[in-house]
A protein has these predicted regions:
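A short beta-loop-beta micro-motif enriched in histidine and acidic residues
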Residues: 64-67, 79-92
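A short, N-terminal "cap"/entry segment at the start of jelly-roll beta-barrel domains
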Residues: 21-68, 119, 155-162
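Bacterial N-terminal signal peptides that target proteins for export
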Residues: 1-8
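Ligand-binding loop in jelly-roll beta-barrel domains
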Residues: 113, 122-148
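Short beta-strand segments in beta-sandwich/barrel cores
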Residues: 81-82, 99-103, 117
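C-terminal motif of bacterial Sec signal peptides marking the signal peptidase cleavage site
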Residues: 16-19
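Short acidic-glycine-tyrosine-enriched beta hairpin
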Residues: 76, 106-123
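Glycine- and acidic-residue-biased ligand/ion/polar-headgroup-sensing regions
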Residues: 87-106
């Protein structure tokens, strides 16, 4: 009986420790911000300053009227593709995780990786795809006005993303 209990407790310990290691794996991986854990003073880092979108086009003038600021977090599964769309308003963001490939209707492409700042195209039709091996987490900031869409889809565009 004692031997059976001892074996049972040993097996239970292995299962619990193995299970815990498996379930806690994501929390054990290093934070992308671990490099800042030991700073002793406030730091400021300019991630991006531009008047152009990622494809080199000049950003439009600001809208007239009362602004509405919108912050969105997008999460894209591995291999997912966004439909062809355009943005009627200025928007920019930070890719927190993953790898995003953006393709313009004209064929221009941009690969964005975790930690990169991105300034989106305003007006031109484009699409995006998760080309990495983990889900994308993308935080985007929109400078818009109440009632304006953040994006307009173009189902009429049948061009495959290459």
């Amino acid at each position: 009986m004692k031997r059976t209990l001892s074996i049972f407790l040993s097996v239970l310990t292995v299962v619990v420790l193995t299970g815990c290691k498996t379930c806690c794996k994501s929390s054990c991986s290093p934070s992308p911000f671990a490099q800042y854990d030991n700073i002793t003073a406030v730091q400021k880092l300019e991630l991006k300053r531009t008047s152009e979108s990622w494809d080199g086009a000049a950003l439009p003038d600001y809208l007239k009227g009362k602004p509405e600021l919108v912050v969105m977090r997008y999460i894209f599964p591995v291999g997912s593709k966004l439909p062809w769309h355009h943005h009627p308003v200025i928007n920019y963001g930070i890719l927190q995780q993953g790898e995003l490939t953006i393709v313009g209707l004209d064929g221009k492409r941009q690969v964005v990786r975790a930690g990169d700042a991105i300034v989106e195209m305003v007006g031109p039709i484009h699409c995006g795809m998760n080309t990495g091996d983990k889900p994308i987490v993308l935080d985007m900031f929109y400078l818009t006005q109440k009632g304006l869409p953040l994006a307009v889809q173009h189902p009429e565009v049948q061009k495959p993303m290459e």
